[in-house]
């Protein structure tokens, strides 16, 4: 890659390599005077992230990391709704990403195992955290408009006991200074719940990946009102002396509203659940435009840095 960077005909480069190569190539590319677009996460270690961040701030070159949710229309509009108070105060954040696949790719020769399946080994990957959680933690900080102050978590190799080094199951809790918490979970041996970035507010809930929100006022029946309705509908022959005065509330009883008006075509697969355009093409187009104008993107490097250090 160093020979490529020596070319004066090249204005910018796209880096799509194993994570442990991000920092060396980004730093060399900036030093060579190239604009840079790099896959997430920012880098493998905290020191590498700091080196990239500091170098970028001293450079006049453009640097992007593929945080495509920042360019996804439903995420942008959803965040505007959240910050305008539509769902009230943000009181909790819940994110999950579930798959059912071993994350392996075919290896034609044993000596290529760690190069092809680099995501499975600690020297080249942070596992589920850097490969998946990085995107979702950026969304949480975006909604909360700050960084967590403390973290606790655990991970294990629960199912794919095939010689891999990174966990196939992780649970992490992040706490903000005001007590609001992120509950994060990811595993790759069950895909039932798919992927979601859920923002919980005192007046409603946003499910960002689906582009849907629910308002608490759409469903607010008191316990005594429920009991009266049950009697009225002859669910009970008489008022019970020790019967229930409430029933469990479930999401299905809330009215969903689309973040973006009009038809939203939803796709589902191993990687994403969301609108057809998830922001990936837009952020890449923005990078190309920045290469022409030299104008730096707002907050992309900062968000990539903050979400990566949480992984």
Labelled PLM ranges:
Residues 131-142, 148, 152, 169, ...:
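C-terminal helical cap and adjacent loop that interface with cofactors, partners, or active-site loops
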Residues 1-2, 79:
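Short hydrophobic/charged patches on amphipathic alpha-helices used for structural packing
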Residues 58-64, 69-164, 174, 182, ...:
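Predominantly a Rossmann-like dinucleotide-binding segment in NAD(P)-dependent oxidoreductases
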Residues 18-19, 23-71, 85:
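Beta-strand-loop-alpha-helix segment that lines the small-molecule cofactor/substrate pocket
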Residues 24-28, 48-49, 75-76, 104-108, ...:
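Short, solvent-exposed loop/turn and secondary-structure capping segments
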